[in-house]
């Protein structure tokens, strides 16, 4: 309002670092005639001599160079766990329209937050391919909300992969979230094995080479995977050996549970712990 009242202007100048809020502003400006947007790549402007650019590429590496000099929002950000793999997914055209195949069951993989976001991936296993057809994320709502979302999507579900701590009973109700989900019709379930986070990350890396993503329905989940990164120690100026917890954690964790918790008969994934809970009242 302060700008509008005075017929003022706002200028946003920045360097890409994945498709974050700066990307959202830039993307919106491209389709709004009241905005002006421009991208000035070093290779286009001719301001810097070629030998200087070549030296920068050798020193910085391809991804950082693409961000800093070529204004790339697609380049892997520093410390990203899946930067290389997601770049390959993009370059090979595996982010596209991926329709639901009614002849194949849908597997969901959940990251259940307590007072935090809950994320769900929807996958179909067709031959060696893992097709991510949908993604959903929300916060501040109960489990009944997610059960309703699954019902409204009208997919035929084969299994629901849940984290191992879903079996812990809550103090307030004396029931586990597993029991609550079962009462809401979320069955059968697969309990993902309890593994080290690094092992799960490696499982996702191995799986991403076979993944296809629906560009529209999985957009936020795709960006979560692209930007999921190591925690950075600002004081020591080093990467810590653990993930940074932010908005990307939810989608990345749900993908990790999918990678370690479900085995398609045609795949080489490890055996899951499966429990059919139809008998729980």
In which residue ranges do the predicted regions lie?
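Short, flexible loop motifs at catalytic/binding sites
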Residues: 1-78, 97-281
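Catalytic beta-strand/loop cores that center a nucleophilic Ser/Cys/Thr
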Residues: 82
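Glycine-/acidic-rich phosphate or pyrophosphate-binding loops and their flanking alpha/beta elements
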Residues: 85-102
């Amino acid at each position: 309002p302060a700008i509008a009242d005075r017929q003022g202007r706002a200028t946003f100048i920045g360097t890409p670092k994945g498709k974050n809020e700066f990307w959202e502003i830039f993307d919106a400006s491209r389709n709004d005639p009241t905005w002006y947007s421009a991208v000035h790549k070093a290779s286009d402007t001719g301001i810097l001599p070629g030998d200087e650019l070549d030296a920068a590429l050798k020193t910085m590496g391809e991804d950082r160079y693409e961000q800093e000099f070529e204004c790339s929002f697609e380049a892997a950000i520093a410390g990203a766990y899946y930067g290389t793999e997601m770049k390959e997914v993009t370059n090979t055209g595996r982010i596209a329209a991926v329709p639901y195949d009614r002849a194949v069951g849908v597997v969901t993989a959940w990251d259940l937050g307590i007072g935090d976001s809950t994320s769900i991936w929807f996958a179909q296993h067709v031959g060696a391919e893992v097709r991510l057809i949908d993604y959903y994320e929300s916060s501040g709502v109960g489990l009944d909300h997610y059960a309703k979302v699954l019902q409204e999507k009208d997919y035929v579900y084969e299994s629901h992969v849940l984290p191992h701590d879903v079996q812990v009973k809550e103090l307030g109700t004396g029931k586990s979230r597993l029991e609550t989900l079962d009462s809401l019709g979320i069955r059968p379930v697969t309990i993902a094995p309890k593994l080290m986070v690094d092992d799960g990350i490696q499982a996702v890396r191995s799986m991403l080479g076979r993944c296809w993503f629906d560009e529209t329905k999985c957009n936020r989940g795709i960006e979560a995977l692209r930007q999921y990164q190591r925690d950075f120690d600002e004081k020591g100026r080093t990467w810590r050996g653990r993930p940074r917890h932010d908005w990307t954690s939810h989608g990345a964790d749900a993908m990790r549970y999918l990678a370690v918790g479900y085995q398609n008969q045609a795949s080489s994934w490890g055996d899951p712990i499966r429990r059919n809970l139809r008998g729980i009242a």
